[in-house]
């Protein structure tokens, strides 16, 4: 429970669904801008390219267990929660968001322009700040909400690659 693996605080289902949809839409907007800039680059979802339905089990395992769960445990579960015990939430959330953005930006820094790298850092950081806010202020400290949003976003990325949608 100290890391946020606990049930979501009682909120109206419609409110929770709105926060989840909002996070997913935020990611989708980001993805629509970034994908064309990184299309020719080998990414984590490149392995699914053109595989269609055959990739679905791999996409689900990758999206739910390999990426979103460990990242949510580390950034929102561990880092944010530990720092929020020692500083105001807004500072702790900003730090974890910057760390999350930097991690994702650094992965692309050697293969995209500096501008694209900063774009990736900024938007993944903004999404991370949103996820931290939703977890701590709307879901009672549970990371399940951000895990759902993050997993859905990664599933979308995998499906786009598998079915060559963009």
Regions found by a protein language model. Name each.
Residues 1-70, 85, 112, 116:
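Juxtamembrane helix-loop-helix connectors linking adjacent transmembrane helices
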Residues 24-33, 97-107, 151-159:
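Aromatic-anchored segments of alpha-helical transmembrane domains
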Residues 64-69, 73, 93, 101, ...:
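Short alpha-helical catalytic segment bearing the HExxH-like zincin motif
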Residues 70-95, 135-141:
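Membrane-interface helix/loop boundary segments of multi-pass membrane proteins
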Residues 114-166:
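Functionally important transmembrane alpha-helices
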């Amino acid at each position: 429970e100290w890391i946020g693996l606990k049930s979501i605080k009682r909120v109206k289902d419609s409110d929770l669904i709105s926060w989840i949809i909002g996070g997913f839409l935020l990611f989708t907007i980001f993805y629509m801008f970034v994908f064309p800039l990184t299309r020719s680059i080998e990414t984590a979802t490149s392995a699914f390219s053109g595989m269609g339905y055959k990739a679905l089990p791999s996409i689900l395992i990758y999206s739910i267990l390999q990426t979103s769960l460990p990242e949510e445990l580390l950034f929102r579960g561990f880092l944010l929660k530990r720092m929020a015990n020692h500083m105001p939430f807004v500072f702790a959330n900003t730090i974890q968001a910057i760390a999350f953005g930097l991690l994702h930006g650094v992965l692309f820094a050697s293969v995209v322009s500096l501008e694209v790298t900063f774009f990736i850092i900024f938007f993944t950081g903004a999404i991370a700040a949103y996820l931290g806010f939703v977890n701590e202020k709307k879901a009672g400290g549970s990371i399940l909400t951000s895990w759902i949003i993050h997993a859905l976003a990664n599933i979308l990325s995998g499906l786009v690659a598998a079915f060559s949608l963009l």
